[in-house]
Amino acid sequence: MSEAEKTDVLLVGAGIMSATLCALLRLLEPNWSMTLVERLDGAAAESSDPWNNAGTGHSALCELNYTPARPDGSIDIAKAVNVNEQFQVSRQFWTYAVENGVLPDVRSFLNPIPHVSFVTGADNVQYLRKRYEALVGNPLFGTMEFIDDAGEFARRLPLMAEGRDLREPVGLNWTQDGTDVDFGALSRQLLGFGAQQGMDTLFGHDVTNLSQNSDSTWTVKVVNRRTGRKRTFNAKFVFVGAGGGALPLLQKAGIKEAKGFGGFPVGGQWLRTGNPELTAKHQAKVYGLPPLGAPPMSVPHLDTRVINDKSWLLFGPFAGWSPKFLKQGKVTDLPFSVKPDNLVSMLGVGLTEMGLLKYLIGQLLLSEAARVENLREFAPSAKDSDWELDIAGQRVQVIRKAKGKGGVLEFGTTVLSAADGSIAGLLGASPGASTAVPAMFDVMKRCFADRYPSWEPKLKEMVPSLGVTLSDEPKLFEEVWARGTKVLKLDKPAGAIPATTDGQSTAGTEHTPTAATV
């Protein structure tokens, strides 16, 4: 057997998480050797691919599941603020990366698109008013508007107004400062920077085994999927950023921190159109309320997307189901992930998450016509012939042990790391990619505890708010926000966005609040 090739850092998976960690470590430790292993033939071809996710820069501006109403009717904004704080960290790092040549083409991955919450019915409009009142006093949400005027609704969202009975109350929380993110293009630029700085990249290679050595390093065996050639690496640190493939690899590694964890795969589907007559009439990411009793992943939204310099509309998500943990995975992924240490967790979720089961069954029974009928709640004039069904990526929801319940399903992103800091991985889904930078800061703090203090001055240069809650520091927020807006070109209209039917565009422009705006 050939001698193991030594590397300081080995990254598994070429998606947004590995790409972000790659760029951060390259900037902090340019002399470290680094190797990337990806099973597919290109970067960001699974969950980070723009067609496999919603592309929302998740900052809780429009996602109503982050702002639940309390029993007394008041609005709990804690989760929304936390998600937004994390997105601000990512936004600041992208700003630094653009300024320093790490990200050479900002418009290829980031476009300004308003983020909008949408409801109908008097009670829901009242909820949206309360949500606005609870959030707008926080600096991170200071530009939010509340709109309940039918005429203003029709002006800003003409496609959604077309064919709608506007005698029924409608309400919007409108934030002009939202973003559409192509995480695939972003990942490729970050990995391109890593490769330029000497990182070895192995595409079309599978990791077949991971085992820890007595000196805490890892022996990682890989195989070329085309030629069958086998290689062995000796890595001081391993990061498993393999999306749905992370859990099986962490199980192979045998770290005790992964014991008890399970995964439940849920597929995504979208209706999409590139019809310019329709894209001109809708220039926002508009999120509604989830169906009663449905899981957070079911929140419906009608989104403007900018992908490869073309404007699209996506509506969904609709759930699909497959036992695969990756879109290009294997049908054995789910059954092979069941182990003695997570069997109770998996069975517990099966017995307690009846709402999810009911939701999935209902989704799987939907016909094409029924999906378009759901779309008509947002765009009443939608025609079946204008829309096509697109199969998106797989998301593996985390199952964690819980006392008295066996296991619970977690909707979010979870970092797992070994106690000795020699290996880490990321599990879960939304807000996921939008929080890649703070998630990787967490990985670095856990796994490089001895070095992290010496990195902090450089990290603070990248992210000026590091260690600070921006909600409590409005002046600092104003400074980093203004700098980011200029550097990231978020003060310019979005690329590939056509003018609306009245010759104006709501995307990527500032506007003066009207009489319809509270």
Swiss-Prot record:
Q: State the reactions this protein catalyses.
A: (S)-malate + a quinone = a quinol + oxaloacetate
Q: Which Pfam families match?
A: Mqo
**Has the keyword Oxidoreductase been applied to this entry?**
yes
InterPro entries according to UniProt: FAD/NAD-bd_sf, MQO
- Cite the annotated pathway: Carbohydrate metabolism; tricarboxylic acid cycle; oxaloacetate from (S)-malate (quinone route): step 1/1
User: Which Gene Ontology terms cover its molecular function?
Assistant: 2-hydroxyglutarate dehydrogenase activity; L-malate dehydrogenase (quinone) activity
Name the keywords, alphabetized: FAD, Flavoprotein, Oxidoreductase, Tricarboxylic acid cycle
E.C. no: 1.1.5.4
| Annotated stretches, region: Disordered | 495-518
Q: Which GO terms describe its biological process?
A: tricarboxylic acid cycle
Q: Specify residue ranges for compositional bias: Polar residues.
A: 501-518
Q: Which cofactor does it need?
A: FAD
Q: Which HAMAP family match?
A: MQO
Q: Fetch the PANTHER family from UniProt.
A: L-2-HYDROXYGLUTARATE DEHYDROGENASE, MITOCHONDRIAL
Tell me the protein family, please: Belongs to the MQO family.
Protein name (Swiss-Prot/TrEMBL): Probable malate:quinone oxidoreductase
